[in-house]
Amino acid sequence: WWGPGYGGYGPGYGSGLGDAFSDMFGDGYGDFNFGMSGGG
């Protein structure tokens, strides 16, 4: 599912079946502040 990703350089929370990399590297496919962990 789609969840909020906190910080572009910190941990991303919420990504389930989206992208594990966004979750680990902190919303790498979204914004640098607040985005969607799992895409963008």
Curated annotation (Swiss-Prot):
Disulfide bridges in this chain: none
Superkingdom of this protein's organism: Bacteria
Short name of any one Pfam family annotated for the protein: SGP
Function: Structural protein of the sulfur globules, which are intracellular globules that serve for sulfur storage in purple sulfur bacteria.
Assembly mode: The protein envelope of the sulfur globules is composed of the three different proteins TR0, TR1 and TR2.
Family note: To C.vinosum CV1 and CV2.
Name listed for the protein in its UniProt record: Sulfur globule protein TR0
Protein source organism: Thiocapsa roseopersicina
